[in-house]
Amino acid sequence: PGGCPVIPDRLLWEDADQRIQLYERYLEPVLTSTALGSIEWDSLMEIPRPLWVFEDLYCHDHPDTDPFDVYGTDWPVDEMAVQLSRYFDGVTEEQLINKYQDIYDPASGTLHYEGGRGGGPYYLRVTGWEEDGDRLTLHYEEYSAATGEPYEDSACLLTVRLLEDGSFRYLGNHKA
């Protein structure tokens, strides 16, 4: 995780290495999208910008490139649905088209997106977790990179379903 906490995670928790692994596996793939933090959701289409989630997951799965390198500014909806379906249940091309009608080109089957998110760094840490069968719930919080202190009311819960093949699906994000 990024940031410069006043007290390193390894001094806060004996199991800091496991917490860092959980962060890297489940939080980091969607860290800069709108999927984490105070936004509550139970499906991909409830996340304000699924396009950003696609971009983050694409970059996570293809570390040396991004969608702009491959597609330019016209991203194929069918390939977006396939990528997002690796991490979320029930994703369809129709959902993406309906969500982004204003930038959808039916002739090419693409969404025209020129990028641009803005914003600054986002520092999260895993503060706990619970497993219940195939469900894993991560407790996490946003913290100040300057002080290492958690921001007030930043505690959240991210739930994923663990699959037998070692992959997972995001199920929801809620305030703690």
Where are these regions (language model features)?
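Mature, Sec-exported extracytoplasmic domains of Gram-positive
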Residues: P1-A176
